[in-house]
């Protein structure tokens, strides 16, 4: 990844960074909740973004 990024790339990376976090604990506490963890987590070394 170059140090000079276009705004579109930067915005794309920012979105992916926001998506890559665990679910909040209070969501797990909700009644009838079946979500245990965020299945779409991405590790920076294992899975690349295909950029």
UniProtKB/Swiss-Prot annotation:
Keywords: Cytoplasm, Ribonucleoprotein, Ribosomal protein. RNA-binding component of the large ribosomal subunit. The ribosome is a large ribonucleoprotein complex responsible for the synthesis of proteins in the cell. The keyword Metal-binding does not apply. This is Large ribosomal subunit protein eL39. Component of the large ribosomal subunit. Interacts with IMPACT. One of its GO terms (molecular function) is RNA binding. One of its GO terms (biological process) is cytoplasmic translation. Its main location: cytoplasm. PROSITE patterns: RIBOSOMAL_L39E (PS00051). Belongs to the eukaryotic ribosomal protein eL39 family. It comes from the Eukaryota. GO terms for cellular component: cytosol; cytosolic large ribosomal subunit; cytosolic ribosome; extracellular space. It is found in: Cytoplasm.
């Amino acid at each position: 990844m170059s140090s000079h990024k276009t705004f579109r790339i930067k915005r794309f990376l920012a979105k992916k960074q926001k998506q890559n976090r665990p679910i909040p604990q209070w969501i797990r506490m909700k009644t009838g909740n079946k979500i245990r963890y965020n299945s779409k987590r991405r590790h920076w070394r294992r899975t690349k973004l295909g950029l």
